[in-house]
C-alpha cells in the first residue's frame, strides 16, 4: 500500500521513440487494498476518482470513465513503504514477460469497437528493502569489549525477532510476528552481524538467548531496531546500544593451622594470582587462622587490596568494588602461602590452583595444614685402638 502510478494520455498513436514531450492529460493514482472472494488481499490502482491522487479530469461517457483513441503510458513513480522502485517490473496476466520502467499501450479502433493493445490488467512486482544489523557485546562492569579474567565475549548467542504484523521472508522462509527469524553469534571481539540483505523492511528486536563463557545474562537488555534503508547494516555497537553482561564472580575461604597441635596460625598471608591476567592480591588470616574474600567477612571497599590485615578487602578487576558481588572474577587462580612470623618453623604448603566458575559461590579450601620443619641431625662414628666402635651423636 502507498504505491503511486503516473498515467499519461496522448491524443494520437505513438511509440516510445516518438512520444510528444507533453501529454494531453496526466493522472497520478495510488494503490488501495482490496480483498478477493477467497480473502486474499491485493493492492490495486485504477483510473478512477477513488484512486486518484492528482491530475487532470478523467474522460467520461454516460457517467463512466473512458479512454479515447490514442496512446497511454503508465509507470510506477512511488514505491510502497518498504519497497524499491529500482528493479520493479510489470507483467500481464498469463505472461512471463517482465516490463521494466514505462509501459506503453495504444487504444485503437476495430470497426465500432475501441481496442486496447496488450492486456488491461497487469501485476506490478517491487523489490523489498533489505538490510542487516550489527550488535556489540560488552562487559557490564567495565563497558569494555574485552572479557574479564578468563571469561570471553565470544559465542554469545542473539536472537532476532520480527515485530512486524505481516510475515517477513528471511532466507527463503516466512516468519510471523514474534517469531525468531535468525540467530547470530559474537566473534572474538564480541561483535555479531548479519549480512546487509538479510532482513526485510520493518521492525525487529534483538535479545540475548545464551551468555558467553564466564558471563551471566544479567544486564543483557533487549534492543529494538528498524530496517529502513536498502543494503544498510544498522549499527548497534555504540556504548548506548550495545548489550551488556555481568561477569561471574565468586569467593574463596579457608583455615590455616599448624600440624600436631592444630594451632591456628594468625597473620599468615596468601597471594592470590590470576593465571589469565597476572593480577595478584594478598589476603591475611585472622586470629583464628581464618581467611575469606567475601564482603561478608571484610568489605571489598575497606582498604581494598592493601593486603596488610585480615580486615582489608579484596577485589579483582578494574571496576569499582561492589559488596553485592564476589571478589574473584571467573578465572583460574594460583594460591601461594607466603613466609611470615606466623608460620615460622613450619614448611609452607606448595602453591595450588583453584577455579572460580560459579557465580556467588564461595570455594571452600578447607583446612590448610603446615607441617613442622624437620630437624637436621649430625651423626659421627669413631673407632678406638682396640678396634671397638663407639658412637657419639650431636645436634
Mark where each language-model region is.
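Solvent-exposed loop/turn and edge beta-strand elements of beta-rich ligand-binding domains
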Residues: 1-395
